[in-house]
Amino acid sequence: MDRKDVSITSFDGLRLHGRYYEYKKGAPTEILFHGYRGNAERDLCGGVHRCFEIGHNALIVDQRGAGASEGHVITFGAKESRDCLAWVDFVIKNIAKDARIILTGISMGAATVMMAASCPLPENVIGVLADCGYTSTKAIIKKVIRDMKLPAGPIYPLVRLGALLFGRFDPDKESPLTSMKKCTLPVIFFHGDTDDFVPCYMSEENYAACAAEKKRLVIIRGAGHGLCFPVDPDTYFEELRRFFP
């Protein structure tokens, strides 16, 4: 499987790295975004094979602060969503000006593409695939704090202060759920019903909030966090083929 290493410069001057895999010219192109502290090579190679199986080109990207990309601060989709817009522009300018683009993300990557979906986007973007995304940065941070058996009440404000000072973003204001209320692009949501990291109800709430006329929520039985496709690839393929014919 041939790959081409590519890069862009973010709005704040970071060099961001990606790998492009072409299935065939004229096929839809998925831009795939990994989750928190992940990287493209480790977390998205299975996504490339899934793209080829369904007949899509694949651009897998290292999010800021991950893999071969520059940056030291992860912003849970706040700045990553702006990076997503830059990757869309890259595909149109460097791969095909008439490219049909699907924004795909897992976990924090799903938050990234959901937040990007409420921004002005070119008509090339035909839809969004959000796999096990959370409702808001604040909600998932508080959930993780509680999972650590710590009190979220006094600790979260300190986390927020750190984000404001060092990351220049406000976790209270970053919300995929709010973005979904403004999204008119087709969105397909996947979530595993045994996900104990990002609870399944978060995708249910994102789905309910989504303003798009075309939307679908697929719950994969027995799938943990980020494991919908490995647990039930047949259903995953069937749902994607039906949603993006």
Task: Label the model's feature ranges.
Residues 1-25:
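N-terminal cap/lid segment of alpha/beta-hydrolase-fold proteins
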Residues 36-50, 63:
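The serine-hydrolase catalytic nucleophile loop
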Residues 51-70:
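Conserved alpha/beta-hydrolase
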Residues 74-95:
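Alpha/beta-hydrolase active-site loop
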Residues 115-170, 178-179:
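Hydrolase active-site cap/lid region
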Residues 182-184, 189-191, 195:
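Short beta-strand/loop motif that positions the catalytic acidic residue
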Residues 196-202:
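Conserved alpha/beta-hydrolase "acid-adjacent" motif
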Residues 223-233, 237:
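Catalytic histidine-centered segment of alpha/beta-hydrolase-like enzymes
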